[in-house]
């Protein structure tokens, strides 16, 4: 019995490791390990400079940060998508919207409504054009799915 009380193995445990005030979100760790979520701004800018609007549009919607809680990442992705949407000609919008599936249209609608929350110069008029075309393709169901969704962009 005296042998167990003199043991010093308990001193090897770092109790600060188990501090409840040191909370780290598992989703943020997974996102950091997987790389930066959201669209790649350099890829999208390169496609915009080349004039390939449709590929830039799909690249901007790819890897959207829906599951992350980091607002800076979401704001950066919103800026990239808004840049692509404002660079489109109004005659090309319908073709771009029709190239999306149902989930893509819902994601586009999320970005449109997010853009309505924080309007910039001339963005509201462009977003209204996109909203009109997305509503024509996606129907009222896309609006309902966006407004009731828990995961935001």
UniProtKB/Swiss-Prot annotation:
Enumerate the InterPro entries for this protein: ARPC5 (IPR006789), ARPC5_sf (IPR036743)
Single GO cellular component annotation?
Answer: glutamatergic synapse
Q: Does the keyword Cytoplasm apply?
A: yes
Residues where Phosphoserine occurs? 64
Q: Where in the cell is it found?
A: Cytoplasm, Cytoskeleton; Cell projection
Disulphide bond pairs: none
One BP annotation, GO: cell migration
Alphabetically, the GO molecular function entries are: actin filament binding
Q: Does the keyword Cytoplasm apply?
A: yes
Which terms are listed as keywords in the entry?
Actin-binding, Cell projection, Cytoplasm, Cytoskeleton, Phosphoprotein
Q: Pfam families, per this entry?
A: P16-Arc
As for family, the record states: Belongs to the ARPC5 family.
The protein's role, per its UniProt record: May function as component of the Arp2/3 complex which is involved in regulation of actin polymerization and together with an activating nucleation-promoting factor (NPF) mediates the formation of branched actin networks.
Q: Subunit structure of this entry?
A: May be a component of the Arp2/3 complex in which it may replace ARPC5.
State the protein's name.
Actin-related protein 2/3 complex subunit 5-like protein
